């Protein structure tokens, strides 16, 4: 027995943002002849299920999301083809933040991404309080009016000390004083560009390693002081040398102030940050008065001011002592929070000796001057899928890595560079500081236990699987010893790079 069934096709068309059709829509009617016997219908259903499963297996999609809101969609349907992605424009999605935060975000949507990232903290508006934007919008014109007054005051001060007093007429004297004020303020303005650059471009660095950046601030400030010192030799190049020196000192100030605020916050364990800052001013002003007194005694020494080599030698000697004292003052700081440098120390100690050092010992072993990028083993965080796939852009390698790290919030792979091993880490959406610790533990275990050389991709994957197994067995012990050693696990300076994140929810297996 047969019957005729009429189905309007297509039954379902998934609509995507990237696929459109220029053909006019037609309603097709498909006539199918089917048997009324249940067994035949089941066979047709099974065939349809097989085709549907085949499509799902064939079309695997991975979404790579970027910090500026854009994303790239990868189709992993052909193991033999190179990895390719489709870049998608930014989509504005509503979130669950407060109404004030949503209003703040709406007010800045017209700003280009580069300007937004330069002006506002990372994660704005969710990373700051709701009144942040309103305060800054009022603070900005306040600072403008303050600097206008500063220019007028500078001009008056220069007139008072006699600048332009020998120019003849009153009009000429006024013009000379104004020109001198413009040159002096221009010097300050050029220097202010350094603070603008540091605050906008490197603002996210200070919370992680305030010791290092406070030390670098003194190095750069020393270079700026040297340019100021050189104006005595080349007075005709005063504006160039003074502006360069002021620029360097402004960069140093841009590094110094945020770093020291982090250090002050570390001191204020009772929530008394304002009092700690005020008492620090007492220490600083007292030191300033003593230093000014000794400085006046030195320059008042007969014959010293006229001898530039002696001035240079004296300045160099005192500056070296100053840098040594600065290093010693930073070396005694004892942070009980985990940053990337300290995380490397405690992870290596646990992998090699099964011991986690306390924060006092770890801070003593921390290298203040060394950048993380120069530490061994070399670990590159926040890489893209294309970088993970290697030079060959292998789809099969990416699929194997995604499957291996299904339970993790990151993907770690490695490359052999001569005698050194380089690790690359890509984080997934919703990764936390705990995942940063896990990838560090895995990298150090591989560095310690992996054989000197490996021949092919299969051996690399073998070691990766082995390291994941070891980490599953020992990471809980690491966290327990970290807690018992006195480390603050509630607060962490291990930040997940948000420039590139993998959306695991779009990965079908």
UniProtKB/Swiss-Prot annotation:
Disordered: where is this region?
22-49
User: PANTHER family this protein is in?
Assistant: PROTEIN ROOT UVB SENSITIVE 5, RUS1 FAMILY PROTEIN C16ORF58
Report the sequence similarity comment from the record. Answer: Belongs to the RUS1 family.
Output this protein's name: Protein root UVB sensitive 5
The organism of origin for this protein:
Arabidopsis thaliana (Mouse-ear cress)
Q: Which gene encodes it?
A: RUS5
């Amino acid at each position: 027995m047969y019957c005729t069934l009429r189905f309007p096709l297509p039954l379902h068309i998934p609509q995507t943002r990237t696929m459109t059709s220029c053909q006019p829509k037609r309603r097709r009617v498909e006539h199918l002849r089917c048997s009324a016997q249940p067994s035949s219908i089941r066979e047709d259903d099974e065939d349809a299920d097989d085709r549907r499963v085949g499509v799902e297996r064939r079309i695997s999609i991975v979404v790579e999301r970027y910090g500026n809101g854009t994303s790239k969609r990868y189709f992993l349907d052909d193991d033999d083809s190179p990895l390719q992605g489709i870049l998608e424009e930014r989509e504005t999605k509503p979130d669950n933040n407060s109404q004030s935060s949503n209003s703040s975000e709406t007010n800045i949507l017209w700003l280009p991404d580069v300007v937004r990232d330069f002006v506002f903290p990372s994660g704005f508006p969710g990373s700051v309080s709701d009144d942040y934007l309103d305060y800054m919008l009022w603070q900005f014109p306040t600072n403008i009016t303050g600097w206008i007054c500063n220019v007028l005051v500078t001009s008056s001060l220069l007139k008072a000390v006699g600048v332009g007093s020998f120019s003849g007429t009153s009009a000429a004297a006024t013009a000379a004083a104004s020109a001198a004020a413009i040159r002096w303020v221009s010097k300050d303005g050029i220097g202010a560009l350094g603070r603008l650059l540091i605050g906008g471009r490197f603002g996210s660095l200070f919370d992680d390693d305030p010791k290092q950046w406070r030390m670098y601030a003194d190095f750069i400030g020393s270079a700026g002081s040297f340019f100021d010192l050189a104006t005595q030799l080349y007075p005709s190049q005063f504006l160039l040398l003074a502006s360069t020196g002021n620029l360097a000192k402004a960069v140093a100030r841009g590094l110094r102030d945020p770093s020291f605020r982090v250090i002050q916050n570390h001191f204020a364990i009772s929530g008394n940050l304002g009092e700690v800052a005020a008492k620090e001013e007492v220490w600083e002003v007292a030191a300033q008065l003593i230093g000014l007194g000794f400085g006046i005694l030195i320059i008042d020494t007969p014959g010293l001011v006229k001898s530039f080599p002696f001035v240079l030698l004296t300045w160099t000697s005192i500056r070296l002592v100053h840098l040594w004292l600065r290093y010693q003052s930073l070396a005694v700081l004892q942070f009980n929070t985990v940053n990337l440098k300290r995380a490397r120390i405690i992870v290596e100690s646990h992998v090699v000796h099964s011991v986690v050092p306390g924060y006092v010992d770890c801070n003593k072993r921390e290298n203040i001057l060394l950048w993380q990028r120069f530490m061994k083993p070399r670990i590159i965080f926040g890489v893209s899928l294309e970088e993970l796939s290697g030079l060959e852009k292998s789809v099969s390698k990416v699929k194997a890595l995604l499957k291996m790290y299904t339970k993790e919030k990151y993907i770690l792979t490695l490359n052999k560079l001569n005698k050194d091993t380089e690790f690359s880490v890509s984080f997934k959406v919703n990764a936390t500081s705990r995942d940063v610790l896990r990838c560090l533990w895995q990298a150090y275990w591989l560095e310690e236990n992996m054989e000197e050389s490996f021949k092919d991709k299969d051996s690399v994957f073998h070691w990766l699987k082995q390291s994941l197994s070891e980490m599953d067995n020992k990471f809980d012990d690491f966290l327990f010893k970290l807690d018992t050693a006195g480390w603050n696990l509630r607060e962490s300076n291990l930040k997940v790079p948000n420039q590139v994140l993998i959306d695991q929810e779009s990965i079908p297996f």
